[in-house]
Amino acid sequence: MDFAAMTMKNRKDLSPQCGINPCSSEWTWLMMRLKSMSAKGFAGDFKNFDGQEPSELQDALCTVVNNWYNDGPVNAQIRKVLIGEAFDRYTIVHNGVIHIQQGLPSGFVLTVIFNSWVNECYKYLAWLDLAPSSRKALVHCDEDVDSITYGDDNGHAVKEDTLVWFNLRTIGMFLSKHGITYTDEHKNHWSIAKPSVDIQSISFLKRLFVPHPDMPTFFKAPLEKKSIEERLLWVTESKFASPDELLQENIKNSMQDAYQWGPVYFSELRDKIEDALAEVGKAHLMSEISYTGEEMKWFETVPGVVDYAQSKFAQDVFGVGVARA
């Protein structure tokens, strides 16, 4: 768990972005980091990531983890066994026993951490294959490429001279030789996807990078609208909350994500939800979330703003008595 905590704590300097809060100023920092490397790049994904993940990489990552801990051979062996049981395991299905030799189960606490690092390993392995002989050393990869990963999602800012031979298509072709299917973030096969795009146009974690309407140097993280609206259509049965309580929570979450799209979409979605609830006599379930309130919450994530936000910030920026957008 210490290794997982280290990975999350140092995400500003590492590729894995586990622990990031997209609905904060962290999203701005992430885009600024990528743009500091290059204005061009690409975002990728994988088809059946777990099913194509080489167990050798998982084992190699365990060695990296052990080297990081450096706490003796006994603890190292314990970790090897525990992680080995995760990616090379037996499971019972009805009256049969199945042997699974690759991929990590979704319930395993380190799955997203390890998958994020495997994602990074794929980049380095592709570099070793694709780079000209004078640039094979991985230090050159770090000089020319800055990457972000989260599970099987990835984004790469690549210097334009390097993009000629290190891009989404060339990486996809390399990975295909090893039985791994690479796609862009929209699930288009590598062979038909654009080799590179404007780095600001990529999506990551199904979220875009959109300049704030009033402060274009800051970036919002709008989630695709389909994901925002679909959660309003159903709830998952729970022993701890009623269907109405679950729906109310879904409405709250959808409105929080709608804020990222700006005031127009926020108001449109709010009106649709209010009308739908009124039709079935459940108007009381509507969230009290306002666009102004969400804007203030977002501003409070910007370093240096918190103290000011608690005093004159709302009055100076939004005016007095603004309750709804």
Model regions and ranges:
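C-terminal, non-catalytic extensions of nucleic-acid polymerases
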Residues: 235-325
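A generic structural motif
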Residues: 15-25, 71-84, 136-137, 179-194
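Short catalytic/ligand-binding loop motif for oxyanion handling, primarily in non-cytosolic enzymes
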Residues: 50-52, 213, 288
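Polymerase palm active-site segment centered on the conserved acidic dipeptide of motif C
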Residues: 160-226
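Conserved polymerase palm-domain catalytic core
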Residues: 37-150, 155-165, 201
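Core catalytic machinery and nucleic-acid-binding channels of phosphodiester-processing enzymes
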Residues: 3, 7-64
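Ordered core of a single globular domain
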Residues: 116, 120, 168-173, 258
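Extended, charge-rich low-complexity interaction segments
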Residues: 214-250
